[in-house]
Amino acid sequence: MASSGLAYPDRFYAAAAYAGFGAGGATSSSAISRFQNDVALLLYGLYQQATVGPCNVPKPRAWNPVEQSKWTSWHGLGSMPSAEAMRLFVKILEEEDPGWYSRVPEFNPEPVVDIEMHKPKEDPKVILASTNGTSVPEPKTISENGSSVETQDKVVILEGLSAVSVHEEWTPLSVNGQRPKPRYEHGATVVQDKMYIFGGNHNGRYLSDLQALDLKSLTWSKIDAKFQAGSTDSSKSAQVSSCAGHSLISWGNKFFSVAGHTKDPSENITVKEFDPHTCTWSIVKTYGKPPVSRGGQSVTLVGTTLVLFGGEDAKRCLLNDLHILDLETMTWDDVDAIGTPPPRSDHAAACHADRYLLIFGGGSHATCFNDLHVLDLQTMEWSRPKQQGLAPSPRAGHAGATVGENWYIVGGGNNKSGVSETLVLNMSTLTWSVVSSVEGRVPLASEGMTLVHSNYNGDDYLISFGGYNGRYSNEVFALKLTLKSDLQSKTKEHASDGTSSVLEPEVELSHDGKIREIAMDSADSDLKKDDANELLVALKAEKEELEAALNREQVQTIQLKEEIAEAEARNAELTKELQTVRGQLAAEQSRCFKLEVDVAELRQKLQSMDALEREVELLRRQKAASEQAALEAKQRQSSSGMWGWLVGTPPDKSES
C-alpha cells in the first residue's frame, strides 16, 4: 500500500537510485549483485516498465543468459501501468531493505525537526513517569525521531493511563520495561487491562513474538508462549509461526489470531487461539469451507461470529469475498452477498448494532479508497449510504476502533504521505468529524499501526502502537476521549457545518431508510424525542411496504422456479428423445454401411461375371469353329472316298 514520506514519483526515483538504477546510482548489474537473483530481476523489470513502458525490444540471443533473463522479467509484466510498476518497485525494495529510505538523505529535503501537535483549548497538565521512576516534565511536542521533546517546568507524577488528562489530543506514553522491536502490520487487542501485541513486519522479516503492555503500570513484558499443535504434550515445545497482516480478536478471556501472511503460506486460513492463563497457543479446528490464505483482511466480531472481508492472498491477488465463522460451532460459511465492494486490502471494518458491518478505505496495488460500504447482515446486501460532515481523504493501512456508536480512524497512507487526521464516524447518523490532527512524519501518521480501546478508571482511551512511515516505530500513544454527550454534540455541530458527501448506491435500496434503521437500532439514538413516534410510524409503514414488495418478489421467484423446473423437465425429456433418435440413427448408419459393403461386393462379382461371359462366348465360338472344321473335314473325306472307289483307290483302313 501507499507509504508516507516522499510522494510519487520522487519516492520511486529515490528507491531506484538507492537500488542501483538510473543516473543517481550505479548500473543495473550492481543492483543484481546487491540482491538475490530473482529479486534483482524483478526490480529490473519493474524499473524498465516504470521508466520505458511495456517491453517492445526483441528477445536477446540464447548465448547471453543474463540479458535474456532481464528481458524475460521485463516482458512478463505485459501492459502494467507505470504508476503501478513504481509502487511495486518501492514495495519490494522496502520488503528487502526496509531501512533504505533513511539512508538516502539527498532525496529527503525535509530536516528532522520537532513537530508540534495541535494545542488543546486548555493548558495541559500531563506529566508522565519515566522508566526509572523519576518524574519528567510534560511533553508538549513530538519529534519525528521520537527522541526530542519540549517540556514545561511544572511536575506532577501520575500513574498509568491516568497520566493522560488532556482530552482529544494524542499523548506519547513513557513506558517501563523493554520495548518490543519496532514493527508494522502486527496485531493488537486488549484482554483484562493488558494490550497484547503479536507478530508483524520488521526489516522485511515476519515476527512471532508476543508482547503485553500492562495498562495500569504501563510496563512492557515479553510473553514466553508455548505452542500446542495437537493433544500431545511433546508438541508444546514448538513455536507459533511468524506472520504479518493478521487480525487479533478478543473473545472472553482469550483472543484469536486470524489469517496473515507467513513465510510458508498454507492453502487456507489458520485460526490460532491464545490463553493468557496458560500462556499457550493452539490451533483451532474449524469446520466448513475455510477461506483461502491471505493478509490485510478485516475481521470483525459480530455477536458470536467473526466476519472476514477482503485482503490479499499469497499471490498478491486482491480479494473481496465475505466469510463468517460461527464461534460456537467453529464453522465457516461462505456468504454470497449482493452489491459486493471492489477488491481491497488494508482497510478498516466495524460493527454497529450487531447488524451492520461498515467497511472504510483500503486500497489496491495502485489506488487508495475513501469509500464507505455498509453490509446489512440480515439481508446480506451491501450499500453505499449518504454521509455527512467532512469527506475523509483516501487512505490505506489505517487502524480503527469503536467506542459505543463512534468509530475512530487513525493513520494510513494516501500514496503521497501519511494521513495526519484522527477521524470519528458517528455510525447512527453516518457523520464524519475530525477529533485531532498531528503534523509532520510522526508515528501517528503511518501505515500498519494498531489502535485499541480501553476503559481505565471510568475513562475511555484510544491506544496506538507501531507503524511504518519510512521508519519502523515502537512508540505508544494514548488519546483520552471526551464524555459521550460532549462528543455527540460536537459530532452534530460538525454535521451542521460540514458538507455532505453523496455517494451513488450500489444496489437499489432506500439509503435514507437504511440510515433511519441504523438510528433505530442504536442503543444511544434519539428516539425518546417528541418526533420518535412519527418516525416509528413512518418506519413501520415503510417496513410494511418493503415486506409487501418482498412477498411479491418471493411469489414471483417461486413461479419462476416452477417454470424453470418445468423447463428442465421438458429439457430432460427432449434430451432422452434426442439420445433415442441418435441411437436409431447410429443403427441406420451401420446398416447403410453394411449395405454399401454388400453392393460393392456384388459389383465386384458382376464384373467377374462379365469376364466369364466373354470367356464362355469365346469358347462357344471356338467350339463352333471346331465343329465346323470337323464337318468340313468329314465332307472332304466322304467325297474323296467316292472318287477313290471310282478310280480304284482303296479306302483308308484307319478311317474304317
Curated annotation (Swiss-Prot):
Cellular component annotations (GO), alphabetically ordered: cytosol; peroxisome
Keywords for the protein's UniProt record, in alphabetical order: Coiled coil, Kelch repeat, Lipid-binding, Peroxisome, Repeat
Induction section of the entry: Induced by drought stress and wounding.
Residues covered by the ACB domain: 8-102
Coiled coil start-end: 527-636
Region annotation Disordered: where it falls in the sequence: 129-148, 627-656
Disulfide pairings: none
Source species, domain of life: Eukaryota
Residues annotated to bind an acyl-CoA: Y44, G45, L46, Y47, Q48, K70
Subcellular location: Peroxisome
Listed GO MF terms: fatty-acyl-CoA binding
GO biological process: lipid transport
Tissues/organs with expression: Highly expressed in leaves. Expressed in roots and seeds.
Placement of Kelch repeats on the sequence: 194-241, 254-304, 305-354, 356-405, 406-454, 461-507
Family that this chain belongs to: Belongs to the ACBP family.
Role noted for this protein: Binds medium- and long-chain acyl-CoA esters with high affinity. Can interact in vitro with linoleoyl-CoA and linolenoyl-CoA. Binds phosphatidic acid (PA) and phosphatidylcholine (PC) in vitro. May play a role in the biosynthesis of phospholipids. May be involved in lipid degradation via peroxisomal beta-oxydation.
UniProt name for this protein: Acyl-CoA-binding domain-containing protein 6
Organism: Oryza sativa subsp. japonica
